[in-house]
C-alpha cells in the first residue's frame, strides 16, 4: 500500500508531500519545535526530520514493538507517549524519552488508547474500554488512578485538549450518530459541537485556538475504517463555520492524533493510494 505524509496549509490550500512509502504508515504528530514528525508503521515508531525527510529514523521503543496509531509528543518536546499491546495483549499507554528508551507504563487498566496531552503537560486524555463501554478518561502524565469523564450510553473516542486547557473535544454517538462534542476537564458541561449528516471523528483543536480539525466520513459509515473517500474539515472553536480543508482517500490512520504544526499554519496527514 502506498502511503504519503502530506503537509497542508489551511490559509492558502497549499500542500507538499514530505514522505512516500509502500509501507502502511499512520498518524503523524508534529514536534513542538516544528522540526520533525513522528508516525507509526509496522508496529514501530518513526521520526521524520523535515530538513531531511527522505530517511525516517526508528525511535527505539524497547519491548514495545506492537504500537498502534495512538501516540504523541509532550508539550515540552522531551517525552514520547505510545499505545502498545506487546506486554498485555491489549493496548496500553506508555511514555519514554523522545529519543528512545525503556517504556514506562502509565495506565494500569487495558485496553487504553492515548489521544491528547494537556497544554501544561500534567495530564493525558485517552479512550478506554471498560466493563460498561468505551469512554473518555484522564490520568496524570506520571501515571496513577484514572478519572472517567463521560458516563457511558454510547461510544466515546478521540479526546484532545483545547490550548487553554479548559476543554476536551471528542467524538461520540451518544446522540445517535458519531458527532463532535466537548467536555470540561472536570467532566462537566458536555456540549455537542457538530450536528450534520456526516460521521465525524478525531477532533484536534489548533494550538492558536482558532479552529478544530477533524475527520468526516460519508453518512452511514460504520466505525472509522481506512481506504474511504473522506474529508478533513475545520470547525470554529465555539461550533459552526464548518468548511472542508482536504478531500482524500484515507480515514483510519490519516489524523488519529494531534497533527497541527506548533504555529497553527499547517497540519500533517496521511493519505493512501487507491487499490
Task: Give the predicted meaning of each segment.
Residues 7-24, 50-66, 96-111, 139-155, ...:
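Multi-bladed beta-propeller domains
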Residues 2-5, 44-47, 89-94, 133-137, ...:
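Structural motif
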Amino acid at each position: 500500500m502506498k502511503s504519503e505524509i502530506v503537509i497542508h496549509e489551511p490559509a492558502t490550500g497549499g500542500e507538499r508531500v514530505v514522505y512516500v512509502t509502500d509501507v502502511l504508515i499512520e498518524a503523524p504528530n508534529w514536534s513542538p519545535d516544528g522540526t520533525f514528525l513522528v508516525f507509526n508503521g509496522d508496529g514501530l515508531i518513526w521520526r521524520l526530520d523535515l530538513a531531511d525527510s527522505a530517511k525516517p529514523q526508528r525511535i527505539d521503543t524497547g519491548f514495545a514493538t506492537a504500537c498502534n496509531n495512538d501516540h504523541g509528543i509532550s508539550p515540552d518536546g522531551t517525552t514520547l507517549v505510545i499505545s502498545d499491546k506487546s506486554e498485555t495483549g491489549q493496548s496500553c499507554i506508555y511514555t519514554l524519552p523522545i529519543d528512545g528508551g525503556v517504556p514506562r507504563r502509565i495506565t494500569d487498566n487495558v485496553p487504553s488508547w492515548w489521544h491528547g496531552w494537556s497544554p501544561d503537560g500534567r495530564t493525558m486524555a485517552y479512550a478506554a474500554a471498560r466493563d460498561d463501554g468505551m469512554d473518555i478518561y484522564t490520568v496524570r502524565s506520571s501515571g496513577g488512578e484514572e478519572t472517567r469523564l463521560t458516563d457511558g450510553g454510547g461510544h466515546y473516542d478521540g479526546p484532545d485538549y483545547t490550548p487553554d486547557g479548559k476543554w476536551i473535544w471528542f467524538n461520540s454517538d451518544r446522540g445517535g450518530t458519531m458527532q463532535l462534542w466537548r467536555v470540561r476537564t472536570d467532566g462537566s458541561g458536555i456540549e455537542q459541537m457538530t450536528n450534520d449528516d456526516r460521521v465525524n471523528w478525531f477532533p484536534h483543536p489548533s494550538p492558536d485556538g482558532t479552529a478544530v480539525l477533524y475527520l468526516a466520513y460519508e453518512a452511514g459509515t460504520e466505525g472509522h475504517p481506512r481506504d474511504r473517500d473522506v474529508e478533513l474539515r475545520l470547525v470554529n472553536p465555539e461550533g459552526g463555520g464548518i468548511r472542508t480543508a482536504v478531500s482524500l482517500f484515507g480515514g483510519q490512520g490519516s489524523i488519529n492524533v494531534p497533527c497541527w504544526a506548533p504555529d497553527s499554519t499547517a497540519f500533517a496527514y496521511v493519505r493512501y493510494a487507491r487499490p
